[in-house]
Amino acid sequence: MSTLVNALGFFTSSTPAAAATKDVRSKEEILKRRKDTIGSKCQIFYSDDPFMVSRASMQYLYDEKSNKFLDCISNVQHVGHCHPKVVEAISKQLATSTCNVRFVSTQLTDCAEQILSTLPGLDTVLFCNSGSEANDLALRLARDYTKHKDAIVIEHAYHGHVTTTMELSPYKFDHGSTVSQPDWVHVAPCPDVFRGKHRLADNELTNEDKLYAAGKQYSDDVKSILNDVESRQCGVAAYFAEALQSCGGQVIPPKDYFKDVATHVRNHGGLMIIDEVQTGFGRIGRKYWAHQLYDDGFLPDIVTMGKPMGNGFPVSAVATRKEIADALGGEVGYFNTYGGNPVACAAVISVMKVVKDENLLEHSQQMGEKLEVALRDLQKKHECIGDIRGVGLFWGIDLVKDRNTREPDQKLAIATILALRKSYGILLNADGPHTNILKIKPPLCFNENNILETVTALDQVLTLMNR
């Protein structure tokens, strides 16, 4: 193993991935070759002037000229780019065994047990390779268990790139995808109290009674869909939603919303599937999972997870109850060639260990509180900031042309992220149904100095734009 480790250069330099800098070719050359060989529909950040990564370390990325950038985008690299403990765990397992899951491995069971220790009420895990796979499998589980076909999703939802999950994703089928909304998918209003169907006034956004009432209205919308589906002699297998909506604009649902929806869905024989692919493993700070945010007793029937759990290594999973898992496929078993392989499981175990050893839940909570204070102060100064919403290290800044009308300002959002990159070395992304939400979802090692740097730069950019 030491020969492999030395050859890869993982532990021979104090700078992670230092070996990568020895083979950095011009961005122009790589982009030309990319255009010739990679599908034109493969998305890329900063498409007019793509960012080329030569190496990465913790919360920083380095371009082809070794310029350093603060990464506020990469929630996948959960505990930090090339975190040495994760790199070590992956490297050791890679040099030990990569045998698939039809052999018995301690890593598979250890990994499943550790995940389940954070999910009360669930007792079974099935492994996959991506969030898209996990969400596809979750729907199959729900259908096989309930014997129903239909699904309820929420506006602007994104659940993956495979055909089934694109059919579950208004984020795709409402925006020109060749995959259209099927008859069995029903779209409920997004529980967004700032832009949604049951929006609140600015002075009501922190009013608990108003938030509860809005949440009740949104859950009643789901109840209406369930009644309509049943009236047509159909059945809903599952309500499917992200715990906190990410691509849809960093939306935090009101307290008790999921709990009330669960009552309605289960009364109609369906299951609750919560997609934690973007928000799990401590990003929200207070809890390990975003659906646990409110401590309201809500327990999903199925939880899907992916992105952060491998810190960049491909791995995902579905957690559920044994009786649901046992219904999968009838007489046909479940096998996934790479899902749950020992290297992937080693990555997950090491990520969870780093989260614990480095107190990253507490750190994310503390950084989130400091970030909120800084962003609220920024909102008071800049009229273009219509709303600030988030928790832990999961935040959205809603940019508007006018606070009264809340008209989204896509042009400003795009100009802002370009200016932050060019002049300040800060990488942010804009998303949401109107592409006007600045998303802050960095690696969890993001610190107080990073917050100050980001907010100061954002303040200066908006000031220069007279906004």
UniProtKB/Swiss-Prot annotation:
Q: Which cofactors does this protein require?
A: pyridoxal 5'-phosphate
Q: Which SUPFAM superfamilies match?
A: PLP-dependent transferases
- Where are the annotated coiled coils located? none
Provide the positions where the record notes the PTM N6-(pyridoxal phosphate)lysine: K307
Q: Which InterPro entries match?
A: Aminotrans_3, Aminotrans_3_PPA_site, PyrdxlP-dep_Trfase, PyrdxlP-dep_Trfase_major, PyrdxlP-dep_Trfase_small
Q: Could you tell me which Pfam families the record lists for this protein?
A: Aminotran_3
CDD domains documented for this protein: OAT_like
> Origin, by domain of life?
Eukaryota
Give GO MF terms, alphabetically: lyase activity; pyridoxal phosphate binding; transaminase activity
Q: Keyword annotations for this protein? A: Lyase, Pyridoxal phosphate
EC?
Answer: 4.2.3.-
Family label: Belongs to the class-III pyridoxal-phosphate-dependent aminotransferase family.
| Name of the protein in question | Ethanolamine-phosphate phospho-lyase homolog 1
| Native source organism of the sequence | Caenorhabditis elegans
